[in-house]
Amino acid sequence: MVQGMNRRDVLRAGAALTAGSTLAAPTVFAQGTGGNLRFAFWDHWVPGSNEALQVLGRQWAERSRVNLTLDFINTTGNQLQLTAAAQAQARSGHDGISLGPWDIGAYADQLEPVDDLIAKLIATHGPINPVAEFLAKRDGAWRGVPATSGTQNKPACVRFDLMQQHAGLDVRAMWPARAERGPGADTWNWDTFLAAAEKCHAAGVPFGLPMGQFTDAVDWVGALFLSYGAAMTDARGNPTIRNNAKLRTAIDMAVKISKFLPNDVWAWDDGSNNRALISGRSALVFNPPSAWAVAKRDAPQVAEQCWTIPMPSGPEGRFIAYLPWTTGIWAFGRNKGAAKSFLEFISSREAAEATTIRSGGYDIPPFGSMSDFKVWETEGPPVGSVFNYPLKPHHQATASIAFSPAPPELASQLYIQAMNTKVIARVAQGGESMDQALGWLEREINNMRRG
């Protein structure tokens, strides 16, 4: 995600990137006479995850007799996003590229439709996550293939010892490492969450929930809003602010929660919550297993006390923050047939499981049929800690992305501008009344719609 940048900004910056960017050394599989193919993938933060794609690439290249090159580009300084912008502007570069959640919309007219490939994948693996579909389709056509590598959920990673000691909640009993709900799971809602947040705050181990303008903050607040049925617009983009009791209730709950968080959460970035958990100062964060994975290395005494559970439910159900990657094929690419073949290969169950294993369970396949990989049962310590990380039927939950059901073009602006956390901050930090904050929100949305 390009924080605070619109497409014009990205294109301008991207033009400069082609001359000055430094990429990791590419992996080249020179196999034969099937032509050349070059892909740019997100440079995975988990050690070994890139190697999983390299192994898969070698297997496919040998079978297909294609000269395949894989580049891995990180998102530090938005390098990957700017690379995509530069290539779209120049109409040359890789044949395919990893695209963040909202990037498909920026380049839809320059991406090859992949409806034929998606139909084959669905016929084999079943339905694709609806959020991935919402983001990857434009004007009824699939413009990218939902990816496994890098795709993440953001459920609750809980210090089960601290939660039980200070809030009286046994999260391992509530959500065991089995496909079943335990005692207390049915009452794991935002009211229970608020009470636990207050108790852990009083004990000096507050929940580590960012409230600023980075993705971790926008994502968890987005899931909270959806669980209250609190939409800022309808599916056509018309504001639904006035007389919206559900939106008021959701904002009120978020304001109440914020009172029991660290004072500086309004300035936290996406690493701050990780650091809070790893340091032992926090009893709960909403995150993929990234913080836990680092704790296994740097603070094993913390990692051994962590347990992943679904997000709390609200009056309209339980929603899990979900952030998918998509792989697009440029329409100006020279080997689009081979590109589709390669993406079909790495979308198989066997390939998805290989990348998920190498990521320590971090990666989430886009197909619900793949939520049963053994890696989530066996990763530890403690063994079973991430069993409930992927969405499972007994969670009775829905994957979500903030600001749906707004049209993707508008939702992406609302997301990048973090309008959900900003409106909360105006009440919780700015001293505004609910009516004042909602009036500001409606004006901002109307300005975005006018362009």
Roles of regions detected by a PLM:
Residues 290-303, 315-419, 450:
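C-terminal lobe and pocket-closing loops
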Residues 100-157, 161, 305-312, 384-392:
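Hinge/lid segment of periplasmic solute-binding proteins
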Residues 2-108, 119-126, 151, 169-176, ...:
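Conserved N-terminal structural module of periplasmic/extracytoplasmic solute-binding proteins
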Residues 95-98, 283-287:
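Paired acidic/hydrophobic, glycine-rich loop segments that form the ligand-binding mouth/hinge
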Residues 116-129, 134, 172-186, 228-249, ...:
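Short, solvent-exposed loop/beta-turn-alpha elements that line the ligand-binding surface or hinge
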Residues 73-83, 187-192, 265-278:
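Short helix-initiation/N-cap motifs at beta->coil->alpha
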Residues 191-200, 236-267, 311:
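Glycine-centered hinge/linker elements that transmit conformational signals in sensory
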Residues 138-150, 154-156, 184-239, 246, ...:
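Extracytoplasmic/periplasmic solute-binding protein
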